């Protein structure tokens, strides 16, 4: 599968390599890569921003890929299980955002209302662990599986 892109040749080559890398995760885990999963992966690679379910459905439909929200949701859960994507919940809007996991990382996130994008809050791992430490004592939440999304605006001097 080769991605079609309106971007530069370098972007297209990077996107194709990225897609191949994600496909190899399915192969290593002996997971079936269905056409709908491949199309969803391709959509996430091409549109690197954060996505809601509705946005993903819209992107797929623009490329003549008929699908349902339930199918997209189920595939995203599989992607999360394989650690291909991060899932973030904006508690003010009750919206869930999905993004490809380009590297293994630990962050606390902030959604900047003005810029309409996620930024990393300047917390060290120990500070983050202390914020959720009461839950991690029971072994149910690991730092890498727990993300905080705060809303508001981030000033330049912060």
From Swiss-Prot:
Coiled coil: none annotated. InterPro entries: FUR, WH-like_DNA-bd_sf, WH_DNA-bd_sf. GO terms for biological process: negative regulation of DNA-templated transcription; regulation of secondary metabolite biosynthetic process. Disulfide bonds: none annotated. Pfam families: FUR. GO terms for molecular function: DNA-binding transcription factor activity; transcription cis-regulatory region binding; zinc ion binding. This is Uncharacterized protein MG236 homolog.
């Amino acid at each position: 599968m080769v991605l079609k892109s309106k971007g530069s040749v370098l972007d297209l080559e990077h996107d194709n390599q990225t897609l191949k890398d994600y496909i190899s995760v399915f192969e290593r885990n002996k997971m079936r890569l269905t056409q709908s999963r491949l199309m969803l992966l391709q959509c996430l690679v091409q549109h690197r921003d954060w996505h809601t379910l509705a946005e993903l459905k819209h992107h797929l439909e623009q490329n003549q890929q008929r699908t349902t929200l339930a199918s997209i949701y189920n595939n995203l859960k599989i992607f999360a299980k394989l650690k291909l994507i991060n899932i973030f919940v904006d508690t003010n809007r009750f919206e869930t955002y999905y993004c490809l996991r380009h590297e293994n990382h630990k962050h606390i996130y902030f959604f900047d209302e003005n810029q309409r994008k996620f930024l990393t809050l300047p917390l060290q791992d120990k500070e983050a662990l202390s914020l959720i430490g009461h839950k991690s004592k029971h072994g149910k939440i690991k730092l890498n599986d727990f993300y905080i999304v705060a809303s508001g605006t981030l000033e330049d001097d912060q």
